[in-house]
């Protein structure tokens, strides 16, 4: 069965699940890794820090986070090589998403319970983000900043909210 559209889970209209230990059957996260590039490097080893920020409050599903991470990281590896940057995914999908499955087709009214006991079963996880939260951060050299910005542009094409790319450190080096 395919996923429901992301618009069903985008808004934060319900309180979060606070006790995950009581929930059974939570699907595993699709996010393979949070740190990419040169894992042994410290952030201070690079003069430029660039971030991808969201511009509104919402939830992003784990599959969307993983696909944006993959597209950005693949572009950086192809253009810069594995050891010339450091990128971090800053959010983790803690929020459990539920879905009340509905039977469809002939005779579904006899099988389905409709809205009786409609709490729903866990179908995935999502990350809750506030306005101006940072999703990705990349550390690079001055010459590589344009490549990182292009990678983040590819990443936010996979995300549903409007995003912006900000230079958090080293902006004076990029201008001169």
From Swiss-Prot:
Keywords: Ribonucleoprotein, Ribosomal protein. Pfam families: Ribosomal_L16. One of its GO terms (cellular component) is ribosome. One of its GO terms (biological process) is translation. GO terms for molecular function: structural constituent of ribosome. The keyword Ribonucleoprotein applies. Disulfide bonds: none annotated. The keyword Hydrolase does not apply. PROSITE patterns: RIBOSOMAL_L10E. Belongs to the universal ribosomal protein uL16 family. This is Large ribosomal subunit protein uL16. It comes from Halorubrum lacusprofundi (strain ATCC 49239 / DSM 5036 / JCM 8891 / ACAM 34).
């Amino acid at each position: 069965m395919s996923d429901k559209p992301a618009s069903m889970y985008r808004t934060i209209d319900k309180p979060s699940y606070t006790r995950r230990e009581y929930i059974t059957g939570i699907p595993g996260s699709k996010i393979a890794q949070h740190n990419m590039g040169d894992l042994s490097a410290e952030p201070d080893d690079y003069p430029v820090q660039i971030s991808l920020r969201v511009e509104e409050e919402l939830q992003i599903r784990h599959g969307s986070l993983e696909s944006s991470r993959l597209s950005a990281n693949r572009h950086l590896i192809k253009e810069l090589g594995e050891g010339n940057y450091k990128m971090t995914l800053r959010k983790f999908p803690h929020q459990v998403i539920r879905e009340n499955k509905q039977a469809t087709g002939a005779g579904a009214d006899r099988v389905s319970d409709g809205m009786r006991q409609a709490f729903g079963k866990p179908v995935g996880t999502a990350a809750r983000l506030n306005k101006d939260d940072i999703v990705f951060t990349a550390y690079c050299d001055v010459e590589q900043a344009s490549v990182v910005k292009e990678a983040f542009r590819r990443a936010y094409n996979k995300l549903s909210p409007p995003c912006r790319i900000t230079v958090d450190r080293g902006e004076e080096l990029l201008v001169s």
